[in-house]
């Protein structure tokens, strides 16, 4: 893996291929290896970069998180993630780059576009679970508060079951999300990673400071992506609302919420049609 030294962290990332830079931002998984099957499909067209977000995988913190980062209203980590992606983009290319964020990674991508538009050539939001600008935002904020409380008091298994039911996660995704790692060490790491995401991201990222105006001013750069196998899920409803209010197009893409793993060939074909 490659390394970029940043304030407070060593950011690690996979890099394959040649051509214009395309950065993938992972969601709850946090690690870029989840995009490697997709990267193989795109490496003849792009320099594909898949990031281990700060606090995940091989990326290392060199300074501790501030105590306030676990506050439900803290924007520290999502803003830090966005700054990391912008600094990575600048280190890799003198030109604006392509960016795709999936799930909570797409919320990071929104903050990249809002705060660092100069690094973005084109950007895609794949099934973002953000609620800040929705008419029923308070309802969804309260639901996420309840989910995190359940995880912390009743355990991860019960809380994640409620999470899946509340967001109407498709069976194809629920099965993959609940699949344990192959080794005991892997299962321990998986548990720690999911608990970290629960405490530091479910509430903070989904209710972070993004408005519809943040999209309309850059609408020519944005594509919304909804999976063909995750119809009816909350993240798709978010994209439908953005589309209705701004006119930014939605493109159907193969697979579900984890379509880049489930159907990497078809996922890549859509990206090449968009950006190739």
Swiss-Prot record:
Gene Ontology molecular function, alphabetical: hydrolase activity
AB hydrolase-1 domain ranges (all copies): 20-137
UniProt EC number: 3.-.-.-
Region (Disordered): 57-76
Gene3D superfamilies in the cross-refs: alpha/beta hydrolase
Highest taxon listed in the record's lineage: Bacteria
UniProt name for this protein: Uncharacterized hydrolase SAOUHSC_02900
UniProt source species: Staphylococcus aureus (strain NCTC 8325 / PS 47)
């Amino acid at each position: 893996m490659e390394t970029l030294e940043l304030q407070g962290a060593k950011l690690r990332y996979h890099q394959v291929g040649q051509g214009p830079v395309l950065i993938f931002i992972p969601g709850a998984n946090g690690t870029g290896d989840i995009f490697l099957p997709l990267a193989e499909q795109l490496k003849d067209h792009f320099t594909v970069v898949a990031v281990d977000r700060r606090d995940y995988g091989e990326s290392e913190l060199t300074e501790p998180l501030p105590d306030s980062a676990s506050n439900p209203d803290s924007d520290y980590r999502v803003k830090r993630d966005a700054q990391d992606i912008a600094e990575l983009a600048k280190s890799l290319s003198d030109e604006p780059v392509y960016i795709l964020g999936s799930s909570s990674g797409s919320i990071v991508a929104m903050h990249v576009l809002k705060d660092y538009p100069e690094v973005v050539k084109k950007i895609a939001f794949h099934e973002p679970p953000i609620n800040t600008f929705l008419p029923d935002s308070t309802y969804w904020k309260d639901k996420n508060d309840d989910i995190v409380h359940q995880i912390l008091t009743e355990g991860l298994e019960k809380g994640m079951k409620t999470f899946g039911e509340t967001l109407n996660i498709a069976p194809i995704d629920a099965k993959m999300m609940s699949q344990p790692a192959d080794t005991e060490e892997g299962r321990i790491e998986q548990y720690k990673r999911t608990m970290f995401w629960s405490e530091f991201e479910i509430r903070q990222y989904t209710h972070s400071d993004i408005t519809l105006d943040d999209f309309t001013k850059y609408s020519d750069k944005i594509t919304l992506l909804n999976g063909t196998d995750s119809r009816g899920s909350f993240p798709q409803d978010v994209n439908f609302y953005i589309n209705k209010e701004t006119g930014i197009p939605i493109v159907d893409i193969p697979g579900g919420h984890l379509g880049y793993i489930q159907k990497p060939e078809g996922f890549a074909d859509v990206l090449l049609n968009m950006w190739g």
